[in-house]
Amino acid sequence: MKHIPNIITCIRILLIPVFCYYLWNDCAIAAGIVFIAASLSDILDGYLSRKLNAVSNFGKLADPFADKVMQISAIILLVLLGRMSAWIMIVMFIKDFILIAGGLLIKFIYKITVTSRWFGKISAFYLNAVLAAGILFSLNKNIIDILMIIAVVMQIITLIGYTTLSLK
């Protein structure tokens, strides 16, 4: 039972190329279903790992890895398909780099592991909702860009929140 959350995370990782195939081949419904299923499985494996007392070092690394790779894949493909502006992708990558580098610095310098907070979960949910909408619906590129700008602002606020909490 304690391995179930990690199995779900591994399945989510295996869904990434399936998602990419469907989105690249203009199967928006299938790509959207896979993306949403992966997003929901993230909620499920987090819940189960806490409920079953099955938090593991593997899960601590693999879970955020699966989330980021799925999100990055969606963003890259939406840009390549002309549904999102490239500058949004660049800003998101810079933000992710700062988040990862900052998290590693805090971990190694201050010996603190940053854990997920409510504001991080809200901004991640919003980002996934915007990406799902961009995948499933033929939204105007400008609309997706505006929604992604809101996601970027939320992510930056989240980054500031995590930094502030970590340095207290």
Language model: regions and residue ranges:
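Alpha-helical transmembrane bundles and membrane-interface segments of multipass inner-membrane proteins
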Residues: 1-168
